[in-house]
Amino acid sequence: MKAIITVVGQDQVGIVAKVANELARLKINIVDISQTLMDHNFTMMLSAEWDDQQLSFAAAKAALESLGEASELTIRIQRQAVFDAIQKL
């Protein structure tokens, strides 16, 4: 499974570490990552992939949304195919 993950929220120490640790726990590989800070607002976009026989998209989504809620961040995940289709419009 290939997916795009976005993380947005108020800047705080350890955002990248929290997200990377959760992805590692889920056995999700970070293929590419980009982040920036805009007036104390943190934004990050990740390209990720994993074996969907081991972890469903729904389970990955639930785990990342839970992390987002606990960390006061908005974390969204989209299937790469959906993201690609949206970009073509």
From Swiss-Prot:
CDD domains: ACT_1ZPV (cd04872). Residues 4-78 form the ACT domain. NCBIfam families: PRK00194.1. Belongs to the UPF0237 family. This is UPF0237 protein lp_2508. It comes from Lactiplantibacillus plantarum (strain ATCC BAA-793 / NCIMB 8826 / WCFS1) (Lactobacillus plantarum).
